[in-house]
Amino acid sequence: MSSEDGIKKLLDAERTAQKIVADARQDRVQKLKKAVEEAEKEIKEFREKKDKEYKEYESKYLGASSETASQLATNANKEIDTIRNETAANKQKVVDLLIKYAITCDN
């Protein structure tokens, strides 16, 4: 009977060990799933934070660049108008000077 008792104890020990291993595997799977969920949550939060920062940066600097471009265009148009007005005002004087120097010859 002692050999049967020994075999029975070994089988019980093996079942207990298998149960412990199965529980450990199940625990590992659950911990892994939990870790993946937490990582995905952190990634989502990080992505949302960076998207928000990017949109703030974009609105701050791209808005300013369109304003700057508009201001530069306005200034350029003003300068062009000024040059055209000065050209129109001085055109006749320049033509007269050119004619005067073309007609007058100094030896």
Swiss-Prot record:
Residue ranges the record marks as coiled coil: none
Presence of keyword Ligase: no
Keywords: Hydrogen ion transport, Ion transport, Transport
GO cellular component: contractile vacuolar membrane; phagocytic vesicle; vacuolar proton-transporting V-type ATPase, V1 domain
Protein purpose: Catalytic subunit of the peripheral V1 complex of vacuolar ATPase (V-ATPase). V-ATPase is responsible for acidifying a variety of intracellular compartments in eukaryotic cells.
Membership in a protein family: Belongs to the V-ATPase G subunit family.
Subunit composition and interactions: V-ATPase is a heteromultimeric enzyme composed of a peripheral catalytic V1 complex (components A to H) attached to an integral membrane V0 proton pore complex (components: a, c, c', c'' and d).
Name of the protein in its database record: V-type proton ATPase subunit G
Source species of the chain: Dictyostelium discoideum (Social amoeba)
